[in-house]
UniProtKB/Swiss-Prot annotation:
NCBIfam families in the cross-refs: lpxC (TIGR00325)
Similarity-based family: Belongs to the LpxC family.
Residue ranges crossing the lipid bilayer per the database entry: none
Binding locations of Zn(2+): H75, H232, D236
Name by which UniProt lists this protein: UDP-3-O-acyl-N-acetylglucosamine deacetylase
One Pfam assignment: LpxC
Length: 294
């Protein structure tokens, strides 16, 4: 099984969630063994999508270095991961990925336009060998060994519109497109108003998020799925876990997880070589792990 990249450059424009200004996004092919690289064209600085470059996880996942950063990367990374793309250059002229419609479907459309091609180098994957768990009170995220990766997520909110929701997603590109990619980010009106007063979430609107006001959903079209909220949490998790630097072969489980817990999980997993094995998918190994990339 070979490494992949996109076959041609594609461009898009969208609004930044926090500043509310137009942002140009360019996806470019990249050679083998380069991974996922962000490039800030306005600063001339670049950095890889990997745990050591994560600098903030408060409201979104942020990667960067002393020369600059990029925020709200998880939706784009979720699409890239689900399409099995190993190497890609993400060019931005601002400090955040455009929010698009609050889901990953716009990024999937860009990847469809670009196409995916194989490179000469064999694909590398991170195979989970031991259970690794990170907790914060009753909240937790964990990974366990499995050759047929699944994401099992449970959320619990006091708000009756969300309540308690659980969903199990069997990882594949087809399943991602059908079950996860269209699930939008969500928030509460009171929180949005507070963020706006702080100069944040200025690009947030009913066009790019599900907004909840006490006991009702403000979006006139309603939800895309009955359990869209927990599906979006899985979307986020797929993006956050892709920061491992190679596709993960293992099961992911979360209860009331977060970007912060996901980041701590990737760090914990990679902190001990007994937790995982970096496997090169030559012809023999590709057959062994074929189900993980169906």
């Amino acid at each position: 099984m070979k490494q992949t990249t996109i076959s041609k450059k594609v461009e898009g424009v969208g609004i930044g969630l926090h500043k509310g200004e137009p942002i140009k996004l360019i996806l470019e092919p990249l050679e083998a063994n380069m991974g996922i690289v962000f490039y800030r064209s306005d600063l001339g600085s670049s950095f890889k999508a990997e745990p050591k470059n994560v600098i903030n996880t408060q409201m979104a996942t942020v990667v960067g270095n002393e020369k600059g950063s990029v925020s709200t990367i998880e939706h784009l990374l979720s699409a890239i991961n689900s399409y099995g793309i190993d190497n890609i250059r993400i060019v931005l002229d601002a400090n955040e990925v455009p929010v698009m419609d609050g889901s990953a479907i716009s990024f999937c459309m860009m990847l469809d336009e670009a196409g995916v091609i194989e490179l000469e180098a064999d694909k590398k994957v991170i195979v989970v060998k031991k259970e690794v768990e990170v907790r914060d009170g009753d909240k937790y995220v964990k990974v366990t060994p499995s050759k047929n990766p699944k994401f099992n997520y449970t959320i619990k909110f006091e708000n009756p519109i969300i309540g308690k929701q659980s969903y199990t997603f069997e990882f594949s590109k087809e399943n991602f497109l059908n079950e996860i990619a269209r699930a939008r980010t969500f928030g509460f009106l009171k929180d949005v108003q507070k963020l706006n007063s702080m100069g944040l979430a200025l690009g947030g609107s009913l066009d790019n998020a599900v907004v909840i006001d006490d006991s009702r959903i403000l979006n006139p079209e309603g939800l895309r799925f009955e359990n869209e909220f927990v599906r979006h949490k899985i979307l986020d998790a797929i993006g956050d876990i892709s920061l491992l630097g190679a596709p993960m072969v293992g099961d992911y489980e979360a209860y009331a997880g977060s970007h912060d817990l996901n980041h701590k999980l990737t760090v914990a997993l990679l902190s001990d070589e007994k937790n995982y094995e970096m496997v090169t998918l030559d012809e023999q190994k590709a057959k062994e792990y074929a189900k993980a990339f169906a």
